[in-house]
Regions:
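Class I S-adenosyl-L-methionine-dependent methyltransferase catalytic core
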Residues: 1-91, 95-241
Length: 241
């Protein structure tokens, strides 16, 4: 399998990503177990569709083990109107280039979803589902040729994303932030200010989506906000309710 290596500038300078002729990655059972440990209480009574998975998929095998109500397919999901109508929730590790298409269909059909996605695809998801939640996953995947992928676009940042909101509420985040623009930019979610002293609006890291709070509304994803003329990493604009 031929590979081409490119290097991004800006905030990703020095980080290399692999572009290969297939963006398929197979999910190991350890990753599937981690996902279901987060979402099982929310999906165990629902009809689940695995749209990018054959009978040997770790998702399918684990769903069998749990006795879940599921269907799977490995053909073109755009042509499976029957399964879109049947299911309550879509769970898969989709080809990453197909994530925007799948998101558009899920939004149109008003279905819940749980995806595996790299950081570079989070913007496409959060633009369509602003209130999506996510959690970290093991950084290990298999290529179709059965080799292991530990570095590159998959492993750099691997997240499980869901609009099913399986994450606990986190009301008391305590943080510090830069106040160098009209809208402060928070650099570390671990130092989130208490609500009573927080500004009305803030740019926060996308890891804010790992927590739920009743007092903040998500407004939009900002690709590269600036502080003193310097680009920062992608941020989420939030506002007090």
């Amino acid at each position: 399998m031929e590979t081409e290596t490119k290097q991004f500038g800006g905030g990703l300078k020095g980080v290399r990503y692999k572009y290969i002729d297939s963006d398929e990655y197979y999910t190991p059972i350890e990753t599937v177990e981690k996902i279901f440990s987060k979402i099982l209480p929310h999906v165990k009574e629902k009809k689940i569709w695995f749209p990018c998975d054959n009978e040997q998929s770790a998702f399918v095998l684990y769903a069998q083990k749990l006795g879940l109500n599921y269907k799977n397919s490995s053909d073109d999901f755009r042509k499976r109107e029957d399964l879109f109508l049947w299911c309550d929730v879509v769970i898969t590790n989709p080809p990453f280039t197909k994530i925007p298409i799948l998101c558009d269909l899920i939004k149109e059909k008003k279905k819940d979803f749980v995806f595996i996605a790299p950081y570079v695809r989070m913007n496409a998801i959060m633009q369509r589902f602003l209130n999506v939640s996510f959690f970290y996953l093991p950084r290990l995947f298999y290529r179709p040729d059965n080799t292991i992928e530990r570095i590159g676009v998959v492993a750099a940042n691997s997240f499980g994303l869901t609009n099913n909101n399986p994450l606990p509420q986190h009301e008391k985040l305590i943080c510090e932030y830069e106040d160098e623009t009209r809208i402060p930019i928070l650099n570390n979610i671990k130092f989130f200010p208490q609500d009573e002293i927080a500004p009305n609006k803030m740019y926060v890291p996308l890891t804010f989506a790992m927590y739920e709070t009743k007092n903040w509304q998500r407004i939009r994803v900002q690709d590269r906000p600036k502080v003193n003329g310097k680009d920062k990493f992608r941020r989420l604009l939030i506002q007090k309710k």
